[in-house]
From Swiss-Prot:
Record protein name field: Small ribosomal subunit protein uS17
UniProt keyword list: Ribonucleoprotein, Ribosomal protein, RNA-binding, rRNA-binding
Stored Pfam families: Ribosomal_S17
A GO term for molecular function: rRNA binding
Membrane-spanning residues: none
Function according to Swiss-Prot or TrEMBL: One of the primary rRNA binding proteins, it binds specifically to the 5'-end of 16S ribosomal RNA.
Amino acid sequence: MSDKIRLLEGKVSSVAMDKTVVVRAERYVKHPLYGKFVKKTTKYYVHDEKNECKEGDVIKFKETRPYSKTKKWCLVDIINREK
């Protein structure tokens, strides 16, 4: 396994579950044939122990041990709070 810690940033899209937030992370991928950069979004389930995130916050999260079947990411820091 790699020693490099995977850190990602994304925007919180749902806080409906207890100690879990749903985060959408955007990335740009080059189309293989046409060469145009296309925006792709990926949905991550992130563990939020203190339930401190709100919908619309921009957060930083890292890969960690599996908390459940789908939740393998943990909250590191809240970068920008939604007002």
